[in-house]
Amino acid sequence: MSQIAVADLTEAQAAEELERLADDLAAHDLRYHQQDAPTISDAEYDALKRRNLDIEDRFPHLVRDNSPSMRVGAARAEQFSPVEHGVPMLSLDNAFSNDEATEFDARIRRFLRLTNEPVFYTAEPKIDGLSASLRYEKGVLVQGATRGDGRMGEDVTANLRTIADIPHRLRGGDPQGGGWPDVIEIRGEVYVELEAFAAFNAAALEAGQRTYANPRNFAAGSLRQIDPKISAQRPLRFFAYAWGLTSEGFAATQWEALGKLRDWGFVTTAPPAERVQDAQGLLDIYAKFEVERPKLAFDIDGVVYKVDDLEQQRRLGFVSRSPRWAIARKFPAQQARTILEAIDLQVGRTGAITPVARLKPVTVGGVSVTNATLHNADEIARKDVRIGDTVILQRAGDVIPQIVGPVLEERPAGAVPFEFPTHCPCHLETPLVRESTAAGAETVVRRCSGEFACPFQRIEHLRHFVSRRAFDIEGLGEKQLAAFFEEGWIKEPADIFKLARDEAKLAELRERDGYGETSVANLVKGIEARRTIGLDRVIYGLGMRDIGETTSTVLARNFASPKGKGGFEDLQAAAERAAGQLPGAVYLELAGAPGVGPKARDELVEAGKGGLKADPWPEADSLEVKIGHAVPKLSKPARVALAERYGDWDTFAQALAQAGQGAPGEDYLQLAAIDGIGPVAAQSIARFFAEAHNREKVANLIAELDIQPVAKPKTDTAVAGKTIVFTGALEKMTRDEAKAQAEGLGAKVASSVSKKTDLVVAGPGAGSKLKTATELGIQVMTEDEWLAMVGG
């Protein structure tokens, strides 16, 4: 789907995208760390995480408790016993350019207050494999684990023992003690060499068995076998590069520590790590490893820089989920050439049209690619890609790979520019519309105007309706939903609940392949379980534009009532009243001008209502000056923006008069004034309920439901009105449960500690947030103390 620049996101759009990114990245973490079957490349994953961080940086108050920026890896799989790491296995922040690598060196210097003194780093190739931790006691391997979520991993000791590179007993020490710490966790990477990977896949293909997409998947799948004998048959290797818990220090520098690891019997990275100095050294070693990369026997995806001095590492400490003293410099995304065979259009839930390139299959970075996003019509025109072109494909930046551009010298004769359709690809062929922003500029997105009449939008609405954060109906997956939609059994959300009581259809379903008594009974049970549901999930499930999960909760709490379907009827009535009082187009255009805030907007509207004479100040030199005479309190940036927008006095005066006539009514203003709603969400809600077909489908749905009101936050508790931060590991409740509990008690839950924070609840592993709270003199309590205070 097309992507709005972070700088252009509204708060509502940012909140909705952060919600989507949290879900998407959690799913990718699960596929990568547990299922060993990632569906996107590392470059794509890094791009998603970077966009998440960029949005959080711009909207820090929207940082979610389940933010990917707070998480490492994924929870352990249930088939393996849990292992708690003595020291968490953290991930590294990334750098993607020379400038970012240089800035890393500058940050280190600023923190350590160094000016001209040299800073030394170890630079190691970043192996693309599966992280593992090995615990040795008195030199003997006693336990091995995967990273898991960084805190809890999976016990794969027996499997790791089968890898020849892993010593069962450390070398070079006295068995009675000495030579190595009594207790130490060695960290490293399990990987497979490219030649061994290719040989395994070739043999598996010939035998009709499963093949793997890339060496990393193969290594992970081979290590995480229930039967260690299978792991023993796989060509697994291990590089050691770090350590976690240790009972005593054993080195003064990272460089010295790597030497000790080799002395104890481990293989460290090849090409070997190098010790470099200052920013230029970081850039030089990166260039060297990039040249050597194609010659290596295994995959590397970058270079890891670590401050060499361990005392400096200790002083630098950690930020969030990563060490301040290390960073991973990633190689650029890999590219390939292929043929653009066709351009298809996909229709989203809100009617947005996304062009998708259909490509001649090509392997990029070990993954076969057949599709790539083209974002929108403007992007196709800008890149001038045409059907039949040879194009350069890059796996980075989007969930589906992207086309960098065409190879013009290979363009076939007769290739013509792509003409973006004017009508939806559905059988109704409804016209596509291109909307305008509040400031009057056209958006890049084209939308199908058919709304619920469009079958593509209807199925996307249904998918959203049954999604995990909406109705989350167990037993009704996308495949079943699509089949029921095609047959006409489910055309709108209400049909789902009608199906559960349609004995004729259920009887027919029991006779079908893949169903039977048990699966149909489970489907009915899943549907019936959602007849009673909270108002917030109902609002979110409707799939209104600009109304994400957070906004749905705000609305549900504001309109909560024991009557009228949990408050839904009150919400609908308020939206319908507001629908007749929406601001006019010229009002929105005027209000969207740069420098025009709410006060300036109101002053302009009042001036327009009073009527402006035709150029009452002809002696003025410019329109900006005339506007200043007409509305004296306007700022200079606002005057300049309005003068550029309207050009002359008559056009400006006419716009002001129209804006005055199009000013919104009181009911709309009340809806928009709800804390957390605002004008964009208010307009979306009002426009949704203004449509007769929406009201009809909503009426059908709520007739099937018992909607429960969402409890309004209390105002008479010990924490009402206070800002609270939860940090560290919570042992008696999840972060979501803690947040819900605090908000229900009238508190505001924040993700970072500041002077405005009233209370920090700190669990095991609390780091920088606890330190900041202590420095600021903010009250800190344990999870048990919190529960005792709130009566949990």
Swiss-Prot record:
NAD(+) binds at D42, A43, E44, Y45, D46, S91, L92, E124, R147, E189, K306, K330. GO terms for biological process: DNA repair; DNA replication. Gene3D superfamilies: 5' to 3' exonuclease, C-terminal subdomain (1.10.150.20), 6.20.10.30, BRCT domain (3.40.50.10190), DNA ligase/mRNA capping enzyme (3.30.470.30), Helix hairpin bin (1.10.287.610), Nucleic acid-binding proteins (2.40.50.140). The keyword Metal-binding applies. It catalyses: NAD(+) + (deoxyribonucleotide)n-3'-hydroxyl + 5'-phospho-(deoxyribonucleotide)m = (deoxyribonucleotide)n+m + AMP + beta-nicotinamide D-nucleotide. GO terms for molecular function: DNA binding; DNA ligase (NAD+) activity; metal ion binding. InterPro entries: BRCT_dom, BRCT_dom_sf, DNA_ligase, DNA_ligase_AS, DNA_ligase_CS, DNAligase_adenylation, DNAligase_N, Hlx-hairpin-Hlx_DNA-bd_motif. GO terms for cellular component: cytosol. Zn(2+) binds at C424, C426, C448, C454. Its EC number is 6.5.1.2. Coiled coil: none annotated. Its cofactor is Mg(2+); Mn(2+). Keywords: DNA damage, DNA repair, DNA replication, Ligase, Magnesium, Manganese, Metal-binding, NAD, Zinc. The active site is at K126 (n6-amp-lysine intermediate). PROSITE patterns: BRCT, DNA_LIGASE_N1, DNA_LIGASE_N2. SMART domains: BRCT (SM00292), HhH1 (SM00278), LIGANc (SM00532). Residues 714-792 form the BRCT domain. DNA ligase that catalyzes the formation of phosphodiester linkages between 5'-phosphoryl and 3'-hydroxyl groups in double-stranded DNA using NAD as a coenzyme and as the energy source for the reaction. It is essential for DNA replication and repair of damaged DNA. NCBIfam families: dnlj, PRK07956.1. Belongs to the NAD-dependent DNA ligase family. LigA subfamily. This is DNA ligase.
